[in-house]
Amino acid sequence: MNFTDMLRAATARHGSLLCVGLDPEPARFPAGMQGDARKIYDFCAAVVDATADLVCAFKPQIAYFAAHGAEAQLERLMQHMRSNAPQVPVILDAKRGDIGATAEQYAKEAFERYGADAVTLSPFMGFDSIAPYLAYRGKGAFLLCRTSNPGGDDLQNQRLASVAGQPLLYEHLASLAQGPWNRNGQLGLVVGATYPQEIERVRSLAPTLPLLIPGVGAQGGDAAAAVRAGLRSDAPIIVNSSRTILYAGAGADFAGAARAQALRMRALLQAARR
């Protein structure tokens, strides 16, 4: 089963558009774990087990593991998700972007070392920096398009005078991803929940691509508005929430608190679908 089929199946099975982002910060762990980077796996695995039946995807952010020398814990976590939640696709949030030869190594890292079902990428260096990931048939690749951070305007909202119609950069990227770059049907786009009008614009330019929508919760994005802007019956959307769920509770039952928050978020997203 390819990534998109896995995503559709998990969305239908769990009645969910919610993705839980796994961004572990040991300083924010509950008592007994707080400040201990050796507990990254334990913390994340507990959240995964508490929410696996409520989500359409999980999204571990590689920097939160690498910063603590916890890549081995990430490998173990990926194996745990494959064993305990095999029906839920895993998106490795890596935002890689490099020349072809180096991209081949990053692709190997994402899909062979970690066994991810999809990966996030920066498309700034063009198609040849993306192609090595697409060599892994059945895997997904989400390209940064209109990101949730304010600084995204510096480049993404600039007009391209040399392109017919003078589209904004993010608009041009959406068109490329929907068209000539999507040779094997593996691409999706990252569009921040903080910009619902831009989500709607991206959806009009890329009507069939999966959209990964971060920026809900701590970043202030409107989850319901994001769903209304991006949802189509024939194209999946994934609404990511990380810190709001991970750190919903600071006590011994932090996983239970994470589940309760995930239930609330799932219900909010479901209500917006109607």
UniProtKB/Swiss-Prot annotation:
Its EC number is 4.1.1.23. The keyword Lyase applies. Disulfide bonds: none annotated. InterPro entries: Aldolase_TIM (IPR013785), OMPdecase_AS (IPR018089), OMPdecase_type-2 (IPR011995), OMPdeCOase_dom (IPR001754), RibuloseP-bd_barrel (IPR011060). It catalyses: orotidine 5'-phosphate + H(+) = UMP + CO2. GO terms for molecular function: orotidine-5'-phosphate decarboxylase activity. The keyword Metal-binding does not apply. It holds the Pfam family OMPdecase. Pathway: Pyrimidine metabolism; UMP biosynthesis via de novo pathway; UMP from orotate: step 2/2. It comes from the Bacteria. The active site is at K95 (proton donor). GO terms for biological process: 'de novo' pyrimidine nucleobase biosynthetic process; 'de novo' UMP biosynthetic process. Keywords: Decarboxylase, Lyase, Pyrimidine biosynthesis. Belongs to the OMP decarboxylase family. Type 2 subfamily. This is Orotidine 5'-phosphate decarboxylase. It comes from Verminephrobacter eiseniae (strain EF01-2).
